[in-house]
Structures are given as structure tokens and as C-alpha cells.
């Protein structure tokens, strides 16, 4: 499960919207919303990598956002 609050916070820090980010990583906006809300498939490794690059996330930030349930 994605830590939605942290992801949204990073998106806002970069002065982007979810629509902007989804377009940059080539994911349909509705699909992106479903994935962050846990409705259906999770993000693929390729998608996590693309998001991390667009938002300039550190490894620790990416882990906290995308893998927090596995680490905690």
C-alpha cells in the first residue's frame, strides 16, 4: 500500500498535481488515482522508478512512500 500522504506531500513540494505527474510517467490519471487509493493493481517497479525520478526522491523517501508496510 502506498503512503498516500507522503506521496501527495512530495507532489505538492514539486509544485505538481497528480494529473501532471501521471502524464509525465505515462499513466492514465484515473489509473494513477486507483493505484494510490489501493483500488486494483499496485504500482509496478517501472512506475515507482519513474515517480521517484520525477519527484527526485531519495531511496529512503521512495521506500517510505511505496514500501512502508513491508519495512514497518
Mark where each language-model region is.
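Short, charged recognition helix plus adjacent turn
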Residues: 6-9, 14-15, 34, 41, ...
Amino acid at each position: 500500500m502506498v503512503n498516500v500522504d507522503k506521496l501527495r506531500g512530495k507532489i505538492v513540494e514539486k509544485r505538481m498535481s497528480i494529473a501532471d505527474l501521471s502524464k509525465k510517467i505515462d499513466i492514465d490519471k484515473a489509473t494513477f488515482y486507483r493505484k494510490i487509493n489501493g483500488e486494483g493493481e499496485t504500482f509496478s517497479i517501472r512506475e515507482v522508478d519513474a515517480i521517484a525520478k520525477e519527484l527526485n526522491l531519495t531511496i529512503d523517501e521512495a521506500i517510505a512512500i511505496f514500501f512502508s508496510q513491508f519495512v514497518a
